[in-house]
Amino acid sequence: MTEMKILIVTLTYIEKSIIDEIVNNLSSYGLEVDILFDSRKYLPISAFNWERLQYDAEKVLSFLKSKYDFNYDSIIFLADSDGYIDGYNFVFGLTIDNFAIIFLNRLREEFYNRKPDLELFMKRVVKEVTHEAGHILGLGHCNTIGCVMNFSNTVEDVDKKQARFCKNCIYKIENLSKYLQRK
């Protein structure tokens, strides 16, 4: 589909099975994926909103962009935190330019006072990482039922979609890739 090198940076412990699923899913689209386990990095306290008890996603991403300078087309961060942007109660993830962050807290069943479910958590993480990778590839939100690029307002919305791009989104990615190769 497109030749792109993506670095996934885990800012928290993530089960290897989840990382493997992320790599397999993104690799199936021809993306080259590397993993960096970097629990030494922290989210900046200056980005934490004490009234909301959440991180300002834009401030966090700006901070992380300044700390990582690798030879990758894109970097996606995974943080075991809760994030928001102005105008929204929360976000599962945010992409700015070629950088994205996924906030994992609300993808866990425990957040909703339910029994932990590692398999369901893994599916949700893979979907949200793929969704943010889609934004990095130039896609907006999609209205095709089940497409990973559907906007998710709730965790139930995440559960309804697949971890795959629909045919229309794949077509858009392929055409954008061809256009960029001609430039």
UniProtKB/Swiss-Prot annotation:
One of its GO terms (biological process) is proteolysis. The lineage of its organism: Archaea, Thermoproteota, Thermoprotei, Sulfolobales, Sulfolobaceae. Belongs to the peptidase M54 family. Keywords: Hydrolase, Metal-binding, Metalloprotease, Protease, Zinc. This is Archaemetzincin. It comes from Saccharolobus islandicus (strain Y.N.15.51 / Yellowstone #2) (Sulfolobus islandicus). Binds 2 Zn(2+) ions per subunit. One is catalytic, whereas the other seems to have a structural role. Its cofactor is Zn(2+). Zn(2+) 1 binds at H131, H135, H141.
